Amino acid sequence: MENRGNFGSKLGVILATAGSAVGLGNIWRFPYMTGQNGGAAFILIYFVCIILLGLPGMLSEFIIGRHGASNAARAYKVLAGGKAWAFMGYMGAICSMIILGFYAVVAGWCLQYLYASIIGQVHGDAEFVKNYFVTFSSDPIQPVIWTIVFILLTHFVVVRGVRNGIEKASKILMPLLFILLLVIVVASCSLPGAGKGIEFLLKPDFSKVDENVLLEALGQAFFSLSLGTACLCTYASYFTRQTNLVKSASQIVIIDTVIAILAGLMIFPAAFSVGVNPDSGPSLIFITLPNVFNEAFAGMPAVGYVISILFYALLVLAALTSTISMHEIGTACFYEELKISRKSGAWIETIICCVIGVFCSLSQGAVPELSLFGKDFLTCCDNFTAQLLMPLGAFLTCLFLGWYVPKKLVHDEFTNNDTLKGRLFPVFLFMIRFVTPACIFLIFLHQFGVL
């Protein structure tokens, strides 16, 4: 079996792992939730949830991954001293494979819209923009092609390995993503009436805070950091023994949150400048925002044209940094467990994800019969991973590390064998034994409508 390699620099660790967390959800979900749930009040609650749930969950996967120094399934075997917990790694790999399949569909739409923006296809009135999306997404050919193209883009990064593929790509994609985001934020905040959008996003309104807002903040903290997918565990297996896990996790959380807030500053000022109250999800980025950009920059068509291109380029980059990490989970499992080359393992992962992606794409209108329990196949995949596999994986990870793995082993990883101060270790252990699992259980109940 070939040498698995590791990250070559601290910057590579931070940018690659932050890239796995930064994705389309930062753009189409966090800003909307912040604006609707009290602005800065929601952000403060979100930070608390990150401390209670996000950081302990991330550190748990980091510890398992770095100590195991292998794919997720084998990492759990190493810490458990046998195969009893190996299913956790396999469950994470399956979860990420399913997510990559349907995520690539939406990422493929972003590629199409980037191309359409370049050739000027998405400029028109509101009805035209809406019909364009409905017609395109239900087409049996084009979305499938773009889905496969996006998965292949991901494949050709992952197949090059950790340093030459994942790390090198992250060092290019993440700074470029940040620059594009800043450019659009400046343009958006410069529009007449943009101040109302900034106020809507950032002005604290504690009157909106209730138990549902608390649960929404918990859920956002959980899903934003890719917990429960074995992604963080897999990336941590490429960390060096000198990597400060606590510091790295804190930096990644800050980057993820800053980008999400900047995404809000990109969306709301432009939307409020033309009197639009944005929604969330795919309709936000494929219907609402094209209309907003068309109307907001109507007096400056050249600027509007450039902003549209930059926006969809931004979405493609955000999606790609996430899909790279998802692909790597399965690739590592395949080539290490089957004792084959990385190239062969990557192709197995790519083919499986392409099959899932094709079914998800066709279920969006071209073949409506592709459904389960009254929901299209893409939605079923989304619900199965978000409502079951991810919360279950993260919950069991906390129990595994908090109660099953020897305390000294966890302490040694937390402190880099006592070369770092371990004052926060008792707090971390208490969190993953009691607080974080309780938070995940609340998310699980909320997902199923019990709370």
Go through each PLM region and give its residues.
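Membrane-embedded translocation segments of transport machinery
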Residues: 2-3, 7, 167, 171-320, ...
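A generic transmembrane alpha-helix motif of multi-pass inner-membrane proteins
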Residues: 376-400, 421-451
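Membrane-interface "cap" regions at the ends of multi-pass membrane proteins
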Residues: 1-28, 57-62, 66-79, 83-90, ...
